[in-house]
Amino acid sequence: MSAIKDHYKQMLDEYHIVWEERQHTEELILNADEVVKSPGIPGDAPMMLKIQEKGIPVISEIEFAGRYTDAKMVCITGSNGKTTTTSLIYHIFKSAGYNVGLAGNIGQSLAYQVATCDYDYYIIELSSFQLDNMYEFRANIAILLNITPDHLDRYNYNMQEYVDAKFRILQNQTDDDAFIFWNDDPIIQRELSKHGIHAKLYPFAEDKREGVMAYTDSDELYFTAPYAFNMEQEELALTGKHNLYNSMAAGISASLSGIGKEVIREALSTFRGVEHRLEYVARVRGVDYINDSKATNVNSCWYALQSMTQKTILIIGGKDKGNDYTEIADLVREKCVGLIYMGLHNEKLHEFFDPFGLPVADVQSMKDAVDAAYRMAKSGEAVLLSPCCASFDLFKSYEDRGEQFKACVRAL
């Protein structure tokens, strides 16, 4: 249990909300009518088990706040791309002059904004952990970007439990609502018939086919409904194949919300990327340093490696969540000229990647990782921090990990 930051204490005091830190007063919690749980707390934590034993309802902050607003909810989930797509949609809505808030895993809490603002729309990034404790909340537009193995340590290493959590974004939707999804995702395709979907379907795909609302053809990105338009891929602010899909999802959601095609096209071309996601840091002695600290699972790293055009030193490692590195094996062989294992327990990385015959280094701090990469990289190559893992073995968060990386690079 950690301390509360000073500015949050000040805010709690301002609103006369009782708080405590570094402890839980069991008597108070177990006498509650309802518990709002932070998504980072696992369901098998000792206090949570006591709450369950007493039969006290447990909800997420999103579920709680959603009771007190009639605003339209545009909700985004998926294993990868959530933050980028959420930020991109928010950028489009703001560009259109909409009265809109940004919440969920990004921005201020939904509860704080509902209490202090009067927005017409909220763009909400939802993790599987948040969805687990949502029951009556309704997304007017639900977006499911993709599903790949992630957080399996929180789901009994059972992929179906994780998949079911992601599909909770559809609960309570009606035929007035919209479900936007990646049509090429095999898991999503397999699951569609299982979940009794009531919303209208708006799939997007890599190629043109019947029924898709956005697709690519040659170097163009096409939107078919409700406002048909196209734009050249090179006009998009975000690069990489994965960002084509993120842009499709964002464009469809904006179109469905009444935003015109010219505004959407302009916003897709002016968006500035998300910090810690394929973020260019600096070029040092001819070597480019890229911060992809937000890549906390293998699939995120796959997208990052796929986008690399230079030979790459990959910094990988952290708190393993049941990772299967097979997904990136071919890309590591093709793109990488060295590996830096950064973590307290790197045995699994050694076992999987050492047979590739690449130069490797073991480190337990960001400074050592950057120094090792600096020694290993040659002019014209790149150093990519894309860890595949959670950050909590050596860092406070993925943001802390990314900030340390940038600071160490700039100190070279």
Language model features by range: what are they?
Residues M1-K9:
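NAD(P)-binding Rossmann-fold cofactor-contacting core
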Residues K9-D13, T326-E381:
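C-terminal helical cap/extension that packs against the catalytic core
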Residues D13-L28:
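Glycine-rich, highly charged phosphate/nucleotide-binding loops
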Residues E20-Q23, I59-E63, G196-T216, A267-S269, ...:
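Beta-strand->loop->alpha-helix junctions that form or flank phosphate-binding loops
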Residues E26-A32, P39-N183, I187-A199, D393, ...:
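Phosphate-binding loop of NTP-binding sites
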Residues A32-E34, Y98-V100, T174-F179, G286-Y289, ...:
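Short active-site oxyanion
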Residues M231-C336:
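Nucleotide phosphate-binding/pyrophosphate-handling subdomain across enzymes
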